[in-house]
Design a protein with these regions (language model features):
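Phosphate-group recognition and catalysis centered on beta-loop-alpha active-site segments
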Residues: 1-344
């Protein structure tokens, strides 16, 4: 197989369902992942954190106060705690203080009910899924749909979890090996905002690795001076020594100012041999690049498909979206337009 070829996927631009179809269902639930699959996502994205007994589960962060009904469970009131994680102090309930059996008694709820009231209608209908359950869903859905549906796990706060005796890298690799998905051509990407854990993972697995980059700040493990430095041509060449691609904030490609022009990041990454999967394409005005907003409220859906088409035109290799069906529509029209131009 040629280097960089994705044998498992039929499309040149991948649709990655960000926390599932999180624009229409509460994030990181089986409801959200199934919705994403039904809408044509190529990959579903579980963020992974460990339980007290070392099981990987899908939550965007280990503080579950905002995404579950834990606050309504009097039996867990005493678990409320204040912790400092990656330099940020927060109060809530944390996955590492619950066994899997205890977490399974909780129910998920919508993170952004003011922006997405329709999602809140599904509050209480889903539990917190394990990584193994998500892998099983992807495999079942692949067989049922006759197309490969991959997974795109992110290791959340790996340095923090290692510091409290719950390292996640080996658990993640073990789950992939058990699934038979520990290969370079498996329908899997592993992503992280940190650097050293990706380097460790490179020694542990041949699965493709993605270095995430934020528009500001630096990796929590202090392995690089800043994400901005990592996004320079020299920084990207260093990333290419251990990663298959990068997952930058979309504002690193198109600055979040009116009339912005795209940066050189995609071209520089491609020159270093890296794929580019930016995040996150969301339909609501508040999240759109300024030129793609429409009159209305922050919750009003703007021109997300135009925004995605623009980024496909810039040369991205995939993209994260909360709305996979809009991503699928945008990709189809962009590829059709490109094919039409190719006839000229």
């Amino acid at each position: 197989m040629a280097a960089g070829q994705d044998r498992a996927m039929p499309h040149p631009v991948l649709i990655i369902a960000h926390r599932g179809a999180s624009g229409e269902r509460p994030e990181h639930t089986m409801l959200s992942y199934q919705r994403a699959i039904d809408q044509g996502a190529d990959y579903i994205e579980p963020d992974l954190v460990p339980t007290k007994d070392g099981v990987l589960v899908a939550r965007h962060e280990n503080n579950i106060a905002d995404t579950t009904d834990v606050a309504t469970h009097p039996e867990f009131a005493a678990r409320k705690a204040t912790k400092t994680i990656d330099g940020e102090t927060m109060t809530g309930w944390f996955t590492e203080d619950f066994t899997l059996a205890e977490l399974k008694t909780l129910r998920a709820k919508e993170r952004l009910p003011q922006l997405r009231p329709g999602n809140a209608a599904f509050d209480g209908q889903a539990d917190i899924p394990t990584f193994d359950e998500i892998i099983a869903l992807a495999k079942r859905a692949s067989a049922a749909n006759g197309r490969m549906i991959g997974i795109y796990p992110e290791t959340k706060h790996p340095s923090y979890f290692a510091s409290i005796g719950l390292p996640t890298d080996a658990r993640l690799v073990a789950a992939l090996k058990a699934a038979g998905w520990d290969r370079a051509d498996a329908p899997v990407f592993i992503q992280s905002f940190e650097v050293d854990n990706l380097k460790r993972l490179k020694a542990m697995t041949s699965v493709r690795l993605i270095q995430l980059m934020a528009a500001t700040g630096a990796p929590a493990d202090h392995a690089a001076s800043s994400y901005a430095a990592m996004a320079t041509p020299a920084g990207l060449r260093a990333v290419a020594a251990y990663a298959y691609g990068i997952g930058p904030d979309k504002a690193m490609i198109l600055p979040a100012i009116p009339g912005a022009k795209p940066t050189a990041l995609i071209a520089d990454a491609h020159a270093a041999g890296l794929k580019v999967h930016p995040w996150t394409f969301r339909a609501e005005n508040i999240f759109l690049s300024p030129d793609y907003r429409v009159p209305g409220t922050p919750a009003t859906h703007g021109r997300i498909e135009d925004e995605i088409r623009a980024f496909i035109g810039y040369g991205v290799d995939g993209f994260f979206t909360d709305y996979p069906y809009k991503g699928a529509s945008a990709r189809a029209s962009a590829l059709a337009a490109a094919a039409e131009r190719g006839k000229d």
